[in-house]
Amino acid sequence: MTVSDAPTPHIHLPDGSCCQPKKFAHLHQHTQYSLLDGAAKLKDLLKWAKEVTPEGQTPALAMTDHGNMHGAVHFYNYAMGMEVKPIIGYEAYVVPGFGTRRDRSRAQDGEKGIFHLTLLARDFEGYQNLCRLSSRGYTEGYYYKPRIDHELLQEHHKGIIAFSGCLGSEVQQLLMQGREDDARARLLWYRELFGDNYFIEIQDHGLPEQKKNNPILKAWAQELGIGMVATNDGHYVKKSDATAHETLLAIQTKATLADENRFKFPCDEFYVKNLEEMQRALPVSEWGEEPFDNTAHIAELCNVELPVGKKRQYQMPQLPIPEGRSMAEELRVQTYAGAVKRYPAHLTEGLLRDYAARSLAELGEADAARVLKRTGGCDSASCDLDTLYTLLAFLGSEWEARGKEAGEKYTPYPALEKMEQDGESGTLPAYAHADCRAARRQDSDTSIELDPDTDDEETTRSHHRYALKLLRRAEYELSVINNMGFPDYFLIVADYINWAKDHDISVGPGRGSGAGSLVAYAIRITNLDPLEFELLFERFLNPDRISMPDFDIDFNDARRTEVIGYVQEKYGTDKVAQIATFGTMASKACLKDVARVMGLEYAKVDKVSKLIPIKFGKSYSLEQAREAVPDIQQMLAEDAQLLEAYEFAQKLEGLTRHASVHAAGVVIGREELTNLVPVMRDTSGEGQVCQYDMKSVEDIGLIKMDFLGLRTLSFLDEAKRILRESGTDFEEKYGDFDHIPFDDEKTYELMSRGDTKGVFQLEGAGIADASRRLKPRRLADIIALSALYRPGPMENIPTYVRRHHGIEEVDYDKDGFPNSKQWLEKILQETYGIPVYQEQIMQIASEVAGYSLGGADLLRRAMGKKDAEEMKRQRQLFVVGAKEKGVPEDEGNKLFDMLDAFANYGFNKSHSAAYGVITYQTAWLKANYPVQFMAALLTVERRDSDKVAEYVSDARKMDLHVLPPDINRSSSDFAVAGEEILFGLYAIKGLGESAVLRILEEREKAGAFKSLADFCSRLGNKVCNRKALESLIKSGAFDAFGERHQLIESLEDALEDAAGTAEINARAQSGMSMMFGMEEVKKERPLRSSIAPYSDLERLAIEKEALGLYISGHPLEQHEGLREAASCRVSDLDAWFALQNVAPGKRQKAVLAGMIEGVVKKPTKSGGMMARFILADESGQMELVAFSRAYDRIEPKLVNDTPALVIVELEAEDGGLRAIAEEIVSIEQLSEVPKVMYVTIDLETASPDALGDFQSVLDEYAGSMPTYLRLETPEQFVVYQLDHGMGSPEAIRALNQTFAWADAHLAYDQQTILGRFAPKPPAWMNRQQGGGMRA
């Protein structure tokens, strides 16, 4: 039958109208959010869908991912931007029946299986019901998949269009089982539920099951009057993507393409077909035009408008506040009350009563009367302080209303303006003198220090002006916040922060640009005075840029969940959720995944992966790397299989790989979240998580809060506890860390030495070295250092250091800014003429070019985005504005260029200042209370044995004693005993938390344990099994009772004695002993003294077994030569590698010393052998790999618990280092290597005269040892070998005693080590003869 002879198809649509022929839209399409199943990236998919849309038809596309709606908002936004109509849906997992979603038993037959059902939102109510269905699938029905059942469909079917589904649907599966009557009954159930919104879905991918089922479905459609719809179950974009999709499925199932039994699609037809291809699959001669035309009509019916973009309405949560006030007024009340506490010397009662009185006068009689009526008639003179704050809040509302009515951008405050004018003219109110006198008698609340011996008029005037400046800043910020509609946000954040503080949960001083707000400081959201640190409010909230404020809040990471719990309890668990985040297939990992499933040799792909550049911490895309790296181009040109893998990886790169929970983001809704977004369960199965990512929840209007966990706050809390329990004077002198002095000499000395292990932000070897070179003298230096030590601005560190030390002057004339230097000098003074902060860009634009600070913030953002048209406009504004201030056009352009270049890496000063304070606090603690500092540090890191080992090593350098656990002295965690640190019982492996608590409880109740037998009799097997008892002995916890080997061998005796004692006690309790007039006593047997004590190495070995690290010593201490021969310690290896400036994809030789542990040997695919092992020194440990080329050579020396020197090749890998073992040098071999004298000289602090003295000392104590001099400046170093050997032990001692800027020590000649033992000539030997640039 030809097309023209085909019968007119039955068209059944909800509104009964007919479709136009020759139309088609894809309504069953999976995207990248069908995780590791959909290989269609949203933008590629929408672009192609638009291309295959029949001419004259509005492009439309449905998104129907498996079980979730993760990508709905992104899909909607991209589609609207690309002029494609978005249809939001999802393919639900259905278990038939009512309440069956809660059934967790495995499927026994088809009815208990999980089936597919295609659902589309017809309107916003339908969208909401999809959110509810998908959510409840996760929260109530999750069992392998997020499942819904017929009960949920009955509850939430309104506004939804449903299709009968693919081969995985209930109807089709029943047909495939030969149960035609059941399939028909199921079809009718759905038809009755959805009515005219139900369609029979027809697909044909050439599969035999479809050929069998489709005629039956067609017959039922015609018989029952149910419309048919043609779909293609798309999983990728184009037919050519089928193999890439097959590869993706293999990655998901961890299979290889060579595995014939792997899960795969049956054909390559699951792509976005054009109408012609669809009609070839479903010929019009057989199906008519109905299945195609219906797709277009359904697309017309689906009209969901999401509240995004300009239609977005913020869903601010409802916070209970006192009756009779608006949210804006409540914020004002809290701000005034808080500001008075923050600035008691300036924002005084007298000032505020004067301000209120003047404001009432400015209002006029009628309006003033109305305001006073709201306060119960109390005026500014008669009201109490709380009512005064309320009065000021009501007055603020009046001025804001007047400002809006007049169309003012910023609220005018006439009374404040007159007070400022009086202050400038010299007219001072009476209270100003009293306030200034009172301020002299108390600690300053600002950086302004008043001289108690002076009482002149000018000082009083300055004091009063500053008070007015504070009041002006508060009023300005309040007007901006309230006019932008965000008072609720500030109050909500302040509520949970103050709850945390009131419950002794540490909160950070601020983070991000929010620290620039005085209102936030007043209501205790932040703890940083923005005026003292010269922070800009406009960097945070800008009336020229309407966007939600965003406070990032740090909490003690151990108690962060308590704060989230408080918010859930306050607003309701159904209104609070964390936010999803999605991991994508990044370039390097994606290439390796594809290569694995294709069976490519790992080494080959690994080599390409390592050539992919990393910029600012982010890898290039595969396309960028291919264009930028000639070596990659060459390797792909020479290897067809590698090229194929690379191109498949390019197709898969960027696809969504997995969903997880965002580290900080929490949303709080005004109403139940599922009215707006779908949710799912977190990994614990308790809390709920939005299915959308952070950008999507913000786009749709939900309010996002950031609850960040900061380990350093846990550390500071732990330190406070230890300081208190160890009897220090800390609390008496300072109260807490917010009140320590910022001018402590010992703290700056510590940072100047680079002794910053464990100090927040200064922990790494690189930044510790930068701190040593900078030698900070003030908090501003610490703030700048953390901002500078990042890719990009790091290149300015040498200049900053030179200017800081007075070696180099700032010269704006020489730099080309003679006419703008009057402003630059002021703005860049604290950073020595170097732009470091984003706020400085804003200040320069404001001062030099006349921008408002709001406009300057827009300039800063434009520079960051590099929009060519916007930059052209901004340049013109800047140059013209600067010209009006007397800056020539060429200088204005040059200044604009400097700011533009800096904008790429400028740092947020508010964030840097807040974190700089925490840096200082931790450094101050280390400098002033080192024992407590280290005990707290070890406690918070106790679960990371590598970190504990590193810090124990640092403690030894500080001459602190870290002792093994002691059963009678140790607490649960690390504790201070005098000037020593005791290991906690929690650190002992095999000893559970409950056992530790029982031990401490027994010790508290019945006193110290007297012996091993006493411990066993009091606690015995009920609390500690034999393995736990052995761990206690091996850790050293029972050292007070005897030698460890003797204790181990006597354990059985002690357990038997304990059992005997228990039996005697039982008889005593029953009264049997007393019946015979006798009292039994079980005598404890002594330790087996005939057992030989452990050797030092044996003792250290069992100590490490029990604690995960060596405490009472280290095996390397007996082999000092090994440590001298190493390039660096294990924990410093990353920093050492960075200093070598190794090119991407290249390797660097190094020499490491340590104990060989955990050797694992295994065969390779090529038939050889390889090994992996751990190398551990006092600072930590790392894994090494020995490939087959080195294996035979080093295998005899791969013996566990053996000290050795290992020559390795290092290469950068995925943000870390991989170490490949090339050779192992034994102790005996090392004894043949001569030692050298190595002297590091700091040229910054060594004067030319002192260098002459150095030569004299060297001559006086000269020996014959080869000698190397390493001469250092802040930006580079050079190593020289002296022509004649002059080193000697005496010279080393004399040089170190005489010159603070010289560090002389013995070392092995690494040239000799590498030349003699390395399998090939080392690449780094030439560096000894030349200079090396610092990273």
Curated annotation (Swiss-Prot):
It is found in: Cytoplasm. It catalyses: DNA(n) + a 2'-deoxyribonucleoside 5'-triphosphate = DNA(n+1) + diphosphate. Keywords: Cytoplasm, DNA damage, DNA repair, DNA replication, DNA-directed DNA polymerase, Nucleotidyltransferase, Transferase. Its main location: cytoplasm. GO terms for biological process: DNA repair; DNA replication. InterPro entries: DNA_pol3_alpha_NTPase_dom (IPR011708), DNA_pol3_alpha_thumb_dom (IPR041931), DNA_pol3_finger (IPR040982), DnaE2/DnaE/PolC (IPR004805), DNAPol_HHH (IPR029460), NA-bd_OB_tRNA (IPR004365), PHP_dom (IPR004013), Pol/His_phosphatase_N (IPR003141). Pfam families: DNA_pol3_alpha, DNA_pol3_finger, HHH_6, PHP, tRNA_anti-codon. Residues 446-458 have a biased composition (Acidic residues). Disruption phenotype: Essential, it cannot be deleted. The keyword Zinc-finger does not apply. Gene3D superfamilies: 1.10.150.870, Bacterial DNA polymerase III alpha subunit, thumb domain (1.10.10.1600), Metal-dependent hydrolases (3.20.20.140). DNA polymerase III is a complex, multichain enzyme responsible for most of the replicative DNA synthesis in bacteria as well as the bulk of DNA synthesis/repair after ionizing radiation (IR). The alpha chain is the catalytic subunit. Following severe irradiation (7 kGy of gamma irradiation) genomic DNA is fragmented. DNA is progressively degraded for the first 1.5 hours after IR, in a step promoted by RecA and counterbalanced by DNA Pol I and Pol III, followed by massive DNA synthesis and genome reassembly in the next hour. This is DNA polymerase III subunit alpha. It comes from Deinococcus radiodurans (strain ATCC 13939 / DSM 20539 / JCM 16871 / CCUG 27074 / LMG 4051 / NBRC 15346 / NCIMB 9279 / VKM B-1422 / R1).
